[in-house]
């Protein structure tokens, strides 16, 4: 079996549309952050959903960095590439970030009620992941010899605990519940599909001998989410890419054929375009193209693909706007 790792990325170009320019009169959304123990020269605010919402500040210990912006929809702001903060239109949110080695502690969460509730929930989810020592990098799991059986069991436990946290949370919007669920599912289901194959490649233990049951049935019952909030999660969309190749590999096996993973950009585009439809196809292809452009190699190859995508599959005008911006 061939190993394929879809790298998680939260660069701005990995965005799915939930953000449009705000209409006149709509309240601005405000984020303020104070950092302690941060060693970088600059503090960066980068929106996961759009490259058009971002800001940077010179880093000074304890200084309040304030950014007000327009958005009509829910977004996730990434601070210094590590800390995710959830914001909706008109929210005001303040947090303190304390850097201790590789860990970032979020404290003093204050602001509008919805923003406080949403970000308390997000931090509770992060705490669960930390306490479980649930790693985001699958290659690191293989290096530590975490068995696929353990990873899959831990993934199921994580999803259950996150669902329980969401049920218990008060004053949270459907959007934050959906986003957190989709992001968690992205990590969990990617582990189901990818980790047994990666572990077999790294540790030379065939999938059939990993005591995980029938690999071909690990994703039974899965139905891709089609809502905009779920498709705005890079983690979830990465998983959807892997799901396409997983299903096509299983189909090839059932037909007695050998599946060849599409390693080339153009081949991946073609396979994903055939597998999905509607909003899911639009989001997946958009992310694939953004990822390729951000890679910075042979970017001119994207021209023909972008034209094909716009002509045949693009429904979301914002995606086209971002691609045009990236190609300038």
Task: Indicate residue ranges for each PLM-predicted region.
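Oxidative protein folding and maturation machinery
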Residues: 106-328
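A non-transmembrane, solvent-exposed segment enriched in polar/low-complexity residues
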Residues: 25-172
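Bacterial Sec-dependent N-terminal signal peptides
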Residues: 1-30
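Generic detector of bulky aromatic hydrophobic side chains
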Residues: 10, 34, 45-50, 215-218, ...
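Generic signature of intrinsically disordered, low-complexity segments enriched in small/polar residues
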Residues: 15-17, 41, 47-48, 55, ...
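Short linear functional motifs in flexible/disordered or boundary regions
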Residues: 21-22, 45, 196
């Amino acid at each position: 079996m061939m190993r394929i790792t879809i790298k998680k990325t939260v660069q701005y170009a990995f965005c799915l549309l939930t953000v449009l320019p705000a209409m006149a009169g709509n309240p601005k959304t405000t984020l303020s952050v104070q950092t302690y123990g941060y060693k970088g020269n600059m503090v960066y605010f980068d929106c996961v959903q759009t490259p058009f919402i971002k800001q940077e500040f010179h880093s000074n210990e304890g200084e309040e960095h304030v950014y007000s912006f327009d958005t009509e929809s829910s977004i996730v702001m990434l601070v210094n590439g590590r800390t995710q903060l959830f914001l909706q239109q008109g929210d005001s949110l303040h947090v303190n970030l304390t850097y201790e080695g590789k860990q970032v502690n979020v404290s003093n969460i204050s602001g509008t009620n919805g923003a406080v509730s949403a970000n308390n929930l997000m931090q509770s989810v992060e705490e669960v992941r930390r306490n479980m020592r649930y790693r985001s990098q699958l290659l690191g799991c293989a290096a530590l010899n975490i068995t696929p059986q353990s990873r899959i069991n831990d993934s199921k436990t994580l999803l259950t605990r996150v669902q329980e946290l969401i049920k218990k949370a008060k004053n949270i919007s459907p959007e934050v519940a959906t986003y957190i669920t989709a992001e968690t599912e992205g990590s969990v289901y990617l582990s189901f599909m990818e980790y047994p194959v990666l572990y077999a490649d790294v540790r030379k233990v065939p999938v059939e001998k990993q005591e995980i049951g029938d690999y071909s049935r690990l994703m039974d019952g899965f139905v891709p989410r089609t809502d905009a909030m779920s498709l705005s999660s890079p983690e979830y969309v990465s998983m959807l890419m892997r799901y396409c190749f997983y299903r096509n590999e299983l189909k090839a096996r059932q037909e007695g054929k050998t599946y060849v993973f599409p390693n080339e950009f153009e081949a991946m585009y073609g396979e994903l375009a055939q597998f999905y439809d509607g909003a899911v196809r639009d989001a997946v292809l958009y992310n694939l193209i953004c990822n390729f452009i951000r890679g910075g190699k042979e970017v001119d190859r994207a021209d023909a693909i972008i034209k094909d995508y716009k002509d045949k599959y693009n429904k979301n005008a914002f995606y086209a706007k971002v691609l045009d911006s990236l190609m300038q």
